[in-house]
Amino acid sequence: MNGFSQQLEDFYPSYFSPSPLGFSEPEVQPVAMNLVPTIQKDIQQQPNRKEVTKIPRASEQSPVQNVRPKEAINTKEADSRNPEPDSSLVSASQRRKRTFFTQAQLDILEQFFQTNMYPDIHHREELARHIYIPESRIQVWFQNRRAKVRRQGAKATKPALASHHYSSTSGAMFPSAPAPNSSSYQMTSSRAQVQPPKEYQLNKFHQSQGFLSYPDSSSDVSRQRFLLSQATPGVYHLPQASSNVYDQNVKSNDPLWGQQQVYTNMESVLNLSRRPQQMPAQPMFMNSFQTNKIIKSKMDTTSPPIPVSTTSSHHSQMSLFAGQDPCHMSTAPGGTYGQISPISDSGVSDTSPEPSSDWEENVSVLLHL
């Protein structure tokens, strides 16, 4: 027993102390022996302290630790490249696919659309079985076809309505605007042809006055008076069918009334020797003016005073020609009167036979008409 305890003390000296209180004395060990176990403990505890206190960097990680993140990254990239198919995405992609119809399918759908524009579910299913197209696609086709019909109808009705509105407004605003080929346009053109303008009528009137013939053999005074009457026809000529009231008004208002009567009567007398049938029907007012008064025309020409003859009372109307020297006038062949007019012919001949009483009587009768 003592031997066994001795062995235990040898193996566990710290638990067996010689003191009576049971406290063992501190064991004194050599310095070299004590340093070795402390160094070993420090070596063993140093990696644990690094792992706890110090966070390793990516460059300081072990190859095993570096492999694991790469594998995780590769798996994430693979997941992003090949995502798992979502049901909503798949259904949306299927709806966006365009349906292509063949010509035979379009003909069948168009033929059915002509008979029925609003097919029900049963008709659509029957068409789907017949042309091998889903019923939903057939429904969409009919919707689009009805919209196309509405667009075409709107385009066809808009121009017609616009033209009707324009015609109604234009008719209300301009009711008398005729078409260029209408009957009113033809009537106005015919009226314009029938009624020439006033300027044309005036020109024609002057031309007709220019064609009037004056006596071939006449005096310079008569020729000058004739030219004056042609230059101003409105002053020296009065209308033949004028009434007495009109003549009186002209007498009172027009200061040249005497000149007008003189030239008018002179013309009628001059034409008497050639064409008695052209004598005017209006009576000549020979006594309405003074014979001894000097007459001034617009061309500042004066005529000598005409002396009044008192030889006979019935020859008072021919007093204009009593003081003038009669001269010979050549008569045209085939003239009405063979006798010679008492009007002078610019002094060509100094002597002329006396006028006969028959000629004077004819002149007086015509003057008294």
From Swiss-Prot:
Origin superkingdom:
Eukaryota
Q: Which of UniProt's keywords are assigned here?
A: Developmental protein, DNA-binding, Homeobox, Nucleus
Which GO BP terms sit in this record? regulation of transcription by RNA polymerase II
Record-annotated disulphide pairs: none
* Subcellular localization, as worded in the UniProt entry: Nucleus
Basic and acidic residues: bias regions: 68-84
Give me the positions annotated for DNA binding: 94-153
Q: Give one GO molecular function term.
A: RNA polymerase II transcription regulatory region sequence-specific DNA binding
Q: Which InterPro entries match?
A: HD, Homeobox_CS, Homeobox_regulator, Homeodomain-like_sf
| Composition-biased stretches (Polar residues) | 179-193, 338-355
Q: Could you tell me what induces this protein?
A: By activin and TGF-beta1 (immediate early response gene).
Q: Which GO terms describe its cellular component?
A: nucleus
Physiological role = May be a transcription factor which play a regulatory role in the development of the embryo.
Q: Which family does it belong to?
A: Belongs to the paired homeobox family.
Name the chain's protein.
Homeobox protein Mix.2
